[in-house]
Amino acid sequence: AIELRKIMSAGQLVSDDILNKIVFDKLANCKSGFILDGYPRTLEQSSFLNNFLTKLSLNLHFIFNIDIDFETLKMRIHKRSLEENRDDDNAEVVETRFNAYINTTKKVSDYYKNNQPTIFYEINGNNEIEKITSKIIKILEK
């Protein structure tokens, strides 16, 4: 846990092997459902997740991609940094993570958008938090 915190505080992505193990350990006991936030972030993690779910005879029901522009993201994280004391809430880390998203995670989003379009939902993350939450709840209630 300490090693993970160091990696995340530097704005780096945790390795696929470590994250896949964590997900495997947690999902193996989640027979009634689960929510993944920030995973998968790479195509390799996506492949692992797909294979893992197939082995457990589980399916994804919803995939949300909350798309937000960099300026709005910086503003929200700055606000969060005033309310919470997180090591990873600084401008350098935010920029590193945003670049990682552009370079790796967007490929995962595109993969699911193209391969599972019936469960993939693009959400405008520039809207107010309440509006984003309301949109997600409406989709879940369908």
What kind of feature is each model-predicted range?
Residues L27-A28, T54, K113, E141:
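Residue-level signal for alpha-helix termini/capping positions
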Residues K135-K142:
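C-terminal alpha-helix
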Residues E3-M8, L53-T105:
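A glycine- and Lys/Arg-enriched "phosphate-lid" helix/loop adjacent to the NTP-binding pocket
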Residues S15, D37-G38, F64-I66, N124-G125:
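Small/polar loops that bind or transfer phosphate-bearing groups
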Residues P40-E44, D67-K74, E128-I129:
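Conserved nucleotide-binding/hydrolysis micro-motifs of P-loop NTPases
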Residues A1-N51, E83, E92:
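ATP-dependent small-molecule kinase phosphotransfer cores
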Residues V14, I18-L27, R86-I132:
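Small-molecule kinase domains that catalyze NTP-dependent phosphoryl transfer to phosphate-bearing small molecules
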